[in-house]
Design a protein with these regions (language model features):
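Short internal beta-strands
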Residues: 19-20, 249, 312
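Short, surface-exposed secondary-structure boundary micro-motifs
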Residues: 70, 228, 278-279
Length: 312
């Protein structure tokens, strides 16, 4: 079920499928993202062993519960843009499809590896595979497990890559056991613009190299910039609704450890660097009746984005 769900998800989101065909190193995190958005284990039934209260709801002893953990995989408080399939999401592995704590799936790493091998084999040998158009999907009649009863695909054997290069049959990619390494999950971006905004302040405007939309972000979000052996976190600013670019402003610290100096002095317009995120550790509660925003020093950047959001 998990593998069928993954193929259905990736072939439905064609850009994601093409991304792992071009860069198979994305496959491990693609597996985690598919388990998040279309996991094969969606709910468990439980019986309360004692009177309790959860989220303000009283649950009596003996009460029968249907715990739909798949809903947590779309919690916007934890996952940025939860409805989107994002192969570069750096916390995809925090899905609950394998459960959590003492009762999590003992075979999760075997399952991960099986899914990776399936995807690697198909992307290497049948990158042109497509879902048959017009089909409808019937799912298992089950409250706990979810997967399509059947998945119809099609391809043209004349386009199989091994016809032009038989050597690819002997070049499967190997994967490490376990969850993907978080720090390896970065996307390439090009520095579209570089601006001197003041003494020691540099604004970078970042875009996808192929002009594809970048992830949406919420007020208070940051990204990790990776270049020149440095990895630094910078708050996002600029126009949130413009998904063609992401913007950061960097303060050059002359006496720092070298990260800000590198991004301010060595990075130029036209350069390609890497980025992780966005991620929000300072989420704005827009339901509050009023807000008082206080910041000093580096904290002013996310606060400005929050002020812009509240003003809008």
């Amino acid at each position: 079920n998990a593998t069928a769900n993954a193929f259905m998800t990736l072939l439905t989101h064609r850009e994601a499928w093409e991304a792992i065909c071009e860069n198979p190193a994305l496959i491990p995190n693609a597996v985690e993202e598919c388990l998040r958005v279309a996991g094969s284990i969606i709910a468990w039934r439980r019986i309360a062993t004692a009177d309790t209260t959860v989220g303000g709801v009283a649950i009596p002893k003996g009460g029968k519960l249907l715990i739909v953990q798949a809903s947590a995989n779309f919690d916007a408080r934890h996952f940025e843009n939860p409805q989107e399939v994002d192969l570069y999401r750096d916390n995809s592995v925090e899905h609950l499809t394998f459960g959590y704590g003492a009762h999590q799936c003992m075979g999760k790493n075997i399952g991960r590896m099986e899914m990776r091998v399936f995807l690697e084999e198909f992307t290497r040998r049948l990158p042109h595979i497509r879902l048959v158009e017009g089909q409808s999907f019937d799912f298992l009649l089950n409250t706990s497990f979810r997967g399509p009863a059947e998945l119809w695909v099609e391809w043209d054997p004349r386009r199989n890559p091994e016809r032009a290069n038989p050597a690819i049959l002997d070049k499967p990619l190997s994967f490490k056991i376990g969850a993907p390494v978080k720090d390896d999950i970065t996307r390439a971006v090009v520095v579209r613009e570089r601006h001197e905004e003041g003494e020691g302040l540099v604004r970078l405007v970042l875009a996808d190299p192929r002009g594809r939309p970048l992830p949406a972000w919420s007020a208070g979000s940051h990204v990790d910039l990776v270049a020149g052996g440095f990895r630094r976190k910078y708050s996002l600013c600029g126009i949130r609704d413009d998904r063609s670019v992401l913007e950061v402003v960097i303060l050059r610290e002359a006496d720092g450890r070298g990260g800000s100096r590198h991004f301010c002095d060595a990075v130029a317009a036209g350069d390609t660097i890497h980025l992780a995120g966005p991620k929000n550790l300072f989420r704005l509660d827009e339901s509050a009746p009023r807000h008082v925003l206080i910041a000093g020093g580096i904290g002013i950047t996310p606060i400005l984005a929050m002020a812009d959001r509240l003003k809008a």
